[in-house]
Amino acid sequence: MKILKAHEMSSIDNKTIEEIGIPSLVLMENASKGVFENIRKYFPDAKNILVVAGKGNNGGDGLALARHLYLNGFSVDIFLAFGEVKGDAKTQLEILKKIGIEPLKKKPDFKEYDLIVDAIFGTGFQPPVKGEVANLIKEINNSSVPIVSIDIPSGLSADTGESFEPSVKADLTVTFQFPKICHYLYPAAKKCGKVEVVDISIPEFLAKDVKRDLLRKSDLKPYKREPDTYKTKEGSVLLVGGSVGKTGAVIMSAKAASRAGAGLVTVGIPRELNPIFESLLIEEMSLPLSGTSRLSVFCVEEILELKDRFHALGIGMGMDRYEEGQDIVISLLEKWEKPILIDADGINNLADYGDYTPLKDREIPAVLTPHIGEFSRLTGYDTKTITYNQIDIAQEFSEKNRCYLVLKGARTVISTPDGRAYLFADGTPALAKGGTGDVLAGILTALIAKMDTEEALKLGVYLHGLAGKVAEKKLHTESVKATDVTESLPEAFREIYVN
């Protein structure tokens, strides 16, 4: 499912009307019917409803909705936020008057209603809200009455995750044909409540050039083992990292890689820390490399000498941030000619190095898996700007540096060297625990060892999020640990592969 910006939705609306030939009033009718059905679904006990309408098409949707409500036995009042309407909204108001519904002459007591419908501003609005309408929105929010927003909560921008003030805080948002960025990116998404997407007969192919997609289970291409397979055919991965105080990170990655289907998992760690790993790893093997409390740059040649044993390399988990670490990461970017994933301190060391030419010049694009703080170091953008615009900034970085990116957070963005982006919006706050990123790094390294990279990232991110939800259901949001996510991977696989 495509995720659109305001100008893209406007263009598609116009093409639907002018080129396809579906009249705007038909689209409005379909939209209002969709909102009506969702009100009946989510608010079955609401009988006394107020529609607050703006003067444009969003207001027109609200006025058409008022007609459907009235004709189906609801008690409906309409209040015009600007005291006037235009275009198709004016047509809808004239219809209402002919069936006996007149707009209220003064602002009502919002608390008297069972439900308020926000139809003030649509996707074309640019914040902030000013004047009397700003006060109106504040009063609606303060009423404690459930709110349904049409298309987007009034006061938000469709194109960003920023939560502008004032803006309506909806319990349900019903949008049309395609979701918008504000429906998913935080903190704006918290203003949207539950989001429902209604088909209003706009042809889907009109959005074919949009490079933003919502990642859903139906988009996945699960890997299937051949009946005559063997362990090395299922991917031999090398995970490099670990330092004093952070040995657990790469261990968690290794165990996750095994659970994610890697045929063989080897952990490359500083030689003096090997006894720790030998005591904690059973199914996975350890590879002692040059280094005492952390890896030495001499480990690069040791890794490259063994490159034929491995199909993919993951580096950075618990690695530490230091000058020699920069040399390790850059050298492997330049010399490792197979799939490579860079996580955690591997990313920090790359950011500290500051020159991403080795990233751009790779024949096989690298995979970077930063959280927003690490991505801030890579890009120079502050974390707030990234949070509000993470899809755009991820796409920009991947295209510019010819790499894959998995930008981790409450919403996870996968971006590709050709500028595509996939948004995973079905995770859980239970994953906000140390180590879950290391688990994801292990899952993804296992999958890129034997799958097309783009498909591997989509599958891995979805698996990780689903495993988090499985663990949360078995335990509790507060009690989930990173290792619980790993142990929940079998159930996540079953849900994707069987169901």
Curated annotation (Swiss-Prot):
Q: Which residues form the YjeF N-terminal domain?
A: 9-208
PROSITE patterns named in the record: YJEF_C_2, YJEF_C_3, YJEF_N
Catalysed reaction per UniProt?
Answer: (6S)-NADHX + ADP = AMP + phosphate + NADH + H(+); (6S)-NADPHX + ADP = AMP + phosphate + NADPH + H(+); (6R)-NADHX = (6S)-NADHX; (6R)-NADPHX = (6S)-NADPHX
The free-text note explaining how the cofactor binds reads:
Binds 1 potassium ion per subunit.
* UniProt region (NADPHX 1), positions on chain: 57-61, 122-128
Q: For the region ADP-dependent (S)-NAD(P)H-hydrate dehydratase, what residue ranges are annotated?
A: 216-499
Q: What InterPro entries does the database record attribute to this sequence?
A: Carbohydrate_kinase_pred_CS (IPR017953), CARKD (IPR000631), Nnr (IPR030677), Ribokinase-like (IPR029056), YjeF_N_dom (IPR004443), YjeF_N_dom_sf (IPR036652)
Enzyme Commission numbers on file: 4.2.1.136, 5.1.99.6
The UniProt annotation places (6S)-NADPHX 1 binding at: D151
Query: What are the protein's UniProt keywords?
Result: ATP-binding, Isomerase, Lyase, Metal-binding, Multifunctional enzyme, NAD, NADP, Nucleotide-binding, Potassium
Give the start-end ranges of region NADPHX 2: 371-377
Cofactor(s) this protein requires: K(+)
State the superkingdom.
Answer: Bacteria
Positions of (6S)-NADPHX 2 binding: G318, D438
Listed GO biological process terms: metabolite repair; nicotinamide nucleotide metabolic process
Q: Which residues form the YjeF C-terminal domain?
A: 214-496
Q: Where does ADP bind?
A: 408-412, 428-437
* Stretches for region NAD(P)H-hydrate epimerase: 1-208
* MF (Gene Ontology): ADP-dependent NAD(P)H-hydrate dehydratase activity; ATP binding; metal ion binding; NAD(P)HX epimerase activity
Cited PANTHER family: ATP-DEPENDENT (S)-NAD(P)H-HYDRATE DEHYDRATASE, ATP-DEPENDENT (S)-NAD(P)H-HYDRATE DEHYDRATASE FAMILY MEMBER
Family label: In the N-terminal section; belongs to the NnrE/AIBP family. In the C-terminal section; belongs to the NnrD/CARKD family.
Q: What does this protein do?
A: Bifunctional enzyme that catalyzes the epimerization of the S- and R-forms of NAD(P)HX and the dehydration of the S-form of NAD(P)HX at the expense of ADP, which is converted to AMP. This allows the repair of both epimers of NAD(P)HX, a damaged form of NAD(P)H that is a result of enzymatic or heat-dependent hydration.
Q: What is this protein called?
A: Bifunctional NAD(P)H-hydrate repair enzyme Nnr
Species of provenance: Aquifex aeolicus (strain VF5)
